[in-house]
């Protein structure tokens, strides 16, 4: 069975969000197996590596419509290709970043984002010491230049790393300027029109979960 006839495209908008969160884990694990020279991988193998039930992995992979071989599993190259395509990692999505503080600066320095289909092409801030400079080759403009740069770059994704007190204001500006998706790193739950995609990634919320679990384990 060749890679071409193993892969069938499917609409990712119908996939449950927990599944979408797990698929990149499978992809990373399968890439590691490829580096070790593996040609085939089964759900059971992946399960042992990432501690997720094999039946759940098989169910998740059914959404991307790749067929495996009985007693052999999935062809590694085919599985990598279909997962990267399904998750949108094969297409480069340009983005603007708003707020070049410690977190924003770290994201600008993270060249690894491009391996997952995201390229931050410009950043915006109001700090005079930052405006007009570059970080990791990425230009930093004044926030007032956003609309002009939208026309120049044609970006549809905004990465939000501003202070919480201006998160909604900057979001409103982004949406009014044509941004269609917001990756929100602030702990503020921004409000957007229904047609705007928002992905909330609050580091502080994850810290709270970790601390709570740690305290619970210590009590036991």
Curated annotation (Swiss-Prot):
Gene3D superfamilies per the UniProt record, alphabetical: NAD(P)-binding Rossmann-like Domain (3.40.50.720), Winged helix-like DNA-binding domain superfamily/Winged helix DNA-binding domain (1.10.10.10)
Compartments, record wording: Cytoplasm
Main subcellular location of this protein, as a coarse class: cytoplasm
GO biological process: negative regulation of DNA-templated transcription; response to redox state
DNA-binding region: 25-64
UniProt entry tagged with the keyword ATP-binding: no
Keyword NAD: yes
Coiled coil segments of this chain: none
Entry-linked InterPro entries: CoA-bd, NAD(P)-bd_dom_sf, Rex_DNA-bd_C_dom, Tscrpt_rep_Rex, WH-like_DNA-bd_sf, WH_DNA-bd_sf
UniProt keyword annotations, A-Z: Cytoplasm, DNA-binding, NAD, Repressor, Transcription, Transcription regulation
GO CC terms of this entry: cytoplasm
GO molecular function terms noted in the UniProt entry: DNA binding; DNA-binding transcription factor activity
Reported function: Modulates transcription in response to changes in cellular NADH/NAD(+) redox state.
Subunit text: Homodimer.
Family: Belongs to the transcriptional regulatory Rex family.
Protein name (database record): Redox-sensing transcriptional repressor Rex
Organism name: Bacteroides fragilis (strain ATCC 25285 / DSM 2151 / CCUG 4856 / JCM 11019 / LMG 10263 / NCTC 9343 / Onslow / VPI 2553 / EN-2)
